[in-house]
Swiss-Prot record:
Listed name of the protein: Growth hormone receptor
Species of provenance: Columba livia (Rock dove)
Cell compartments where the protein resides: Cell membrane
Required for JAK2 binding: region residues: 270-355
PANTHER family for this protein: CYTOKINE RECEPTOR, INTERLEUKIN 5 RECEPTOR SUBUNIT ALPHA
Region annotated Disordered, chain positions: 411-455
Length: 611
């Protein structure tokens, strides 16, 4: 027991010491607030602190100064506003000029504050609060009232010097929390759905419209419906339903239901949320081959099935065609019908078929950019190329035939009696060198062409396999020989290719007649009897023209024994995998006509006359 008393004594001593220590803390005098109730006057209040020697009246002074003043001034009224206050009436109040105030004791300053009057406006509380009953509900449980009050008597609200907003707060008598309504300018505020069996407390406060600080609350107004003679009727509606318990039990039941559904449909939900990964399966291929990495066997299976081939591989058309090698070394030394068809002149003339097709047998045409339905441009190209080809081939055959005849014949008969055919004669100067006869040049050129004649004799009897007779099921083209074309006219090679060294610009008439006579057709036209050409005689264009016309007339009278048949040697377009469209070569063009002119024949005119 003694120990307990000792401990209790120590606790009391410690408590007294703490209280005395807190009392010993010095609190300096401080300005508590400054307020203007009506924006015309204002007052400032302060506290003395715990300085006992400063509690006497007049010990602490309040000094003030406006912005434009230079000296501090003492408070004009310490009595009107109460103890420890200073009142500034309208004569000392300037609304738009800032003030500075401070608490001093002789030379010691305790507190200082600066402000303007419009910032410290705190209106007085409203007065004369009252309420009236508006109506009650049909059940008699709730009622509506309207609360009224008057503005503060100090605020000049009626003249508009200051505008006030009012805030109403109410609560039940037994509650601690006040319910607030939105601030409004009106002095009448309705309250709805108040319970008739309860008593309420109402209070109101105001503030300046441009300020955020409210003034003091008014006196509390008590509202009791029993005072108005309204009896409270207990009703079943007043009994509160335990909504909170209903919400709790409902949430628990819903959670249990969801859990049961998840447990019963676990496998199906798992399939929906996490679908199974499909096993790699290829029709006709064992998945174990892919797992073991046997790619060679998989590739062999894929290659053996057409279903795994690409669409382009299945739909691609392949056309077999005839490949012609124009540079075969075995064929260079011998002349054949293939060389004739595929000679350099022939290929050059066919600009459409001049390049070799190296597309590995894929379906193609010599004119890939030209549509199949438009044959105008391609036909023109083929026709022109065929005409040039036929002319060149015909000229070469005629030259060979001419050389053959020259070699077989012993000699050309000399042209005699040229004096009787030429009306005009002229003699050469005696000092000029005699011209070698034209026939001598022909005889000199004959041995050089004899070797070609032996090789070309077989060419004239060679058939050209240029006609398509059949197309095999495999797509190959069967060619058959065409009809032999007889050359209707021959041309001497030495007349066009041999160059003469001319001493002057005229020619012997006998030499020219020899050349013209050879040009005529050898099969139907008889040989022209040659005359001996005098070295000192010349001919004119009239005699040459007469001879050319007579020879041309005799040639025209004798028809050609065989009409040349065109050979289809140019592939125009691939019509289908088993069809070809060929172009025909053009027929030979007529011979050149002699120009009718008078006078002697110059070298240029002779070149024009000689084909």
């Amino acid at each position: 027991m003694d120990l307990r008393h000792l401990l209790l004594t120590l606790v009391l001593v410690c408590a007294n010491d703490s209280l005395s220590a807190s009392d010993d803390v010095l609190r300096l005098p401080q300005i508590s607030k400054c307020r203007s109730p009506e924006l015309e006057t204002f007052s400032c209040y302060w506290t003395d602190g715990n300085f006992y020697n400063l509690s006497a009246p007049g010990t602490i002074q309040l000094l003030y100064m406006k912005r434009n003043d230079e000296d501090w001034k003492e408070c004009p009224d310490y009595i009107t506003a109460g103890e420890n206050s200073c009142y500034f009436n309208t004569s000392y109040t300037s609304i738009w000029i800032p003030y500075c105030v401070k608490l001093v004791n002789k030379d010691e300053v305790f507190d200082e504050k600066c402000f303007s009057v419009d910032e410290i406006v705190l209106p007085d509380p409203p007065v004369h609060l009252n309420w009236t009953l508006l109506n009650t509900s049909q059940t008699g449980i709730h009622g509506d009232i309207q609360v009224r009050w008057d503005p503060p008597p100090t605020a000049d609200v009626q003249k508009g010097w200051i505008t006030l907003e009012y805030e109403l707060q109410y609560k039940e008598v037994n509650e601690t929390k006040w319910k607030e309504l939105e601030p409004r300018l009106s002095t009448m505020v309705p309250l709805y759905s108040l319970k008739i069996g309860r008593d309420y407390e109402i209070r109101v406060r105001s503030r300046q419209r441009t300020s955020e600080k409210f003034g003091e609350f008014s006196e509390i107004l008590y509202v009791s419906f029993s005072q108005a003679g309204i009896e409270f009727v207990h009703c079943a509606e007043e009994i509160e339903f335990p909504w909170f318990l209903v919400v709790i039990f409902g949430a628990c039941g819903l959670a249990v239901t969801v859990i049961l559904i998840l447990l019963s449909k676990q496998s199906r939900l798992k399939m929906l949320i996490f679908p199974p990964v499909p096993v790699p399966k290829i029709k006709g291929i064992d998945p174990d081959l892919l797992k073991k990495g046997k790619l060679d066997e998989v590739n062999s299976i894929l290659a053996s099935h057409d279903n795994y081939k690409t669409q382009l591989y299945n739909d691609d058309l392949w056309v077999e065609f005839i490949e012609l090698d124009i540079e075969d070394p075995d064929e260079k030394n011998r002349v054949s019908d293939t060389d004739r068809l595929l000679s350099e002149d022939h290929l050059k003339s066919h600009s459409c078929l001049g390049a070799k097709d190296d597309d590995s047998g894929r379906a193609s045409c010599c004119e890939p950019d030209i549509p199949e339905t438009d044959f105008s441009a391609s036909d023109t190209c083929d026709a022109i190329s065929d005409i040039d080809q036929f002319k060149k081939v015909t000229e070469k055959e005629e030259d060979l035939l001419c050389l053959g005849r020259k070699d077989n014949d012993e000699s050309l008969p000399s042209l005699a009696n040229t004096d009787t055919q030429q009306p005009r004669m002229s003699t050469r100067p005696e000092n000029s060198q005699p011209w070698p006869p034209f026939a001598d040049s022909i005889d000199a050129a004959s041995p050089s062409a004899h070797n070609q004649l032996s090789n070309q004799n077989s060419l004239r009897n060679t058939d050209f396999y240029a006609q398509v007779s059949d197309i095999t099921p495999a797509g190959s083209v069967v060619l058959s020989p065409g009809q032999k074309s007889k050359v209707a006219r021959a041309r001497c090679e030495f007349c066009t290719e041999q160059n003469f060294t001319l001493d002057n610009a005229y020619f012997c008439e006998a030499d020219v007649k020899k050349c013209i006579a050879v040009i005529s057709h050898e099969e139907d036209e008889p040989r022209v009897q040659a005359q001996i050409c005098n070295e000192d005689t010349y001919f004119t264009t009239e005699s040459l023209t007469t001879t050319g016309i007579s020879l041309g007339a005799s040639t025209a009278e004798t028809p050609s024994p065989e009409v040349p048949v065109p050979d289809y040697t140019s592939i125009h377009i691939v019509h289908s995998p088993q069809g070809l469209v060929l172009n025909a070569t053009a027929l030979p063009v007529p011979d050149k006509e002699f120009n009718m002119s008078c006078g002697y024949v110059s070298t240029d005119q002779l070149n024009k006359i000689m084909p």
